[in-house]
């Protein structure tokens, strides 16, 4: 009989979520908007150190709303780290922007020297510039330097902190940088609302506009009056209830995720296995192991799959995706190397001692065959 599936990063839920959802049902607010959404937004603003938070249906939706507010179109250049999930760049592309990709450094986050070069080249074109930073795998990029570079080249700076809820950079919370930042509450993230996202900002005009855009941009009138084309992206009151329960246990989840990384560190010792270098303040959303080459990467994934343990390669760089063939890229070799060698390991906050033993045995067996 097959062992139970150990998932990559499943939600960490218990009765607290059900109690919050029951409370939302009892209130009669089951549609988008409602007191749970208001409360969730208040807590998110506090968590991120921002003045405003707007809860929406996904981080992808959150980015598109921000870009729509900025009026991103085909006259814009969107500079994006190449090592990321496609949702970082796809909203800007849908609005018509031309994507330029920038390689990462050894941590997986954007290479600052290459970013400087890309921004300088974009500035020479005279076009409007958008830079979308990424806090990759729950590790914040260098907020201070990126803020300076974007000011220098007059680029609009938005931060994709989808993977980094609870992380920090030099004591600053993830999501505290840029004109706006976004969080993800997808089912695999550090905290979840089943599906959802949020926009974090200190700009009241932006916050008010994206909230309006997320609700079909309905005007304040007795009838349905609209002055712009918009979206239906607002978060449900029920999902916000789940989010509130998740926030209440975030410290526990962060502690568990840190323990998972430490476990893998112990497993790697003496086996010539390597983890992606630790970054101060990371939330340890996923632990990444680096193998010698793509053959070993695929072999380790197969070893785990044979024992019903979910793992997967790190993000395939955007400049290698067929949909972006021919797009400008600065560097690329570092992200290509991480993609060819990196495996995202099972990193759930609810892993049991039995789960850890199963995972450790797989790594032992892999290391023994690898020699």
Question: What does each model-found stretch correspond to?
Answer:
Residues 35-42, 50-54, 113, 121, ...:
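PLP-dependent aminotransferase class I/II
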Residues 90-92, 149, 238:
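Hydrophobic/aromatic ligand-binding patch that stacks against planar heteroaromatic rings
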Residues 95, 152-153, 307:
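Helix C-cap/helix->beta junction micro-motif
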Residues 107-193, 198-200, 205:
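Active-site phosphate-binding strand-loop segment of PLP-dependent enzymes
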Residues 30-77, 91-95, 101, 172:
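Phosphate-binding glycine-rich loop
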Residues 1-30, 346:
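N-terminal "arm"/small-domain region of PLP-dependent enzymes with the aminotransferase-like
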Residues 64-121, 303:
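Conserved PLP-anchoring active-site segment centered on the Schiff-base-forming lysine
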């Amino acid at each position: 009989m097959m062992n139970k599936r150990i998932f990559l990063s499943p939600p960490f839920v218990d009765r607290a979520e059900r109690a919050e959802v029951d409370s939302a049902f009892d209130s009669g607010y089951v549609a988008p908007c409602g007191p749970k959404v208001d409360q969730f937004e208040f807590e998110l603003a506090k968590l991120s150190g921002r003045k405003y938070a707007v809860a929406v249906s996904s981080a992808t939706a959150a980015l598109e709303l921000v870009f729509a507010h900025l009026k991103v179109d085909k006259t814009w250049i969107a500079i994006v780290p190449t090592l990321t999930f496609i949702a970082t760049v796809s909203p800007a592309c849908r609005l018509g922007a031309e994507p330029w990709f920038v390689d990462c450094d050894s941590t997986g986050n954007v290479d600052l020297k290459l970013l400087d070069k890309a921004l300088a080249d974009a500035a020479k074109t005279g076009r409007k510039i958008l830079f979308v930073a990424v806090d990759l795998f729950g590790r914040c990029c260098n907020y201070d330097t990126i803020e300076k570079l974007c000011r220098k080249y007059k680029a609009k700076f938005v931060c994709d902190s989808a993977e980094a809820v609870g992380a920090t950079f030099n004591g600053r919370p993830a999501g505290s940088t840029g004109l706006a930042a976004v969080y993800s509450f997808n089912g695999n993230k550090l905290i979840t609302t089943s599906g959802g996202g949020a926009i974090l900002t200190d700009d009241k005009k932006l916050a008010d506009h994206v909230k309006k855009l997320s609700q079909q941009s309905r005007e304040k009138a007795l009838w349905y009056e609209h002055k712009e084309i918009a979206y239906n992206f607002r978060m449900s009151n029920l999902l916000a209830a789940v989010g509130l329960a998740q926030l209440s246990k975030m410290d526990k989840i962060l502690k568990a995720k840190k323990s998972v990384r430490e476990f893998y560190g112990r497993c790697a010792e003496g086996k010539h296995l390597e983890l992606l270098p630790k970054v101060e303040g990371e939330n340890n959303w996923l632990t990444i192991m680096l193998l010698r080459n793509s053959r070993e990467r695929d072999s380790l994934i197969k070893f785990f799959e044979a024992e019903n343990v979910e793992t997967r390669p790190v993000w395939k760089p955007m400049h290698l995706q067929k949909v972006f063939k021919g797009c400008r890229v600065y560097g690329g070799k570092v992200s290509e190397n991480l993609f060819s060698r990196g495996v995202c390991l099972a990193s759930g906050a609810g892993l049991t001692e039995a789960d850890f033993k199963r995972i450790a045995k797989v790594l032992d067996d892999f290391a023994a065959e690898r020699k």
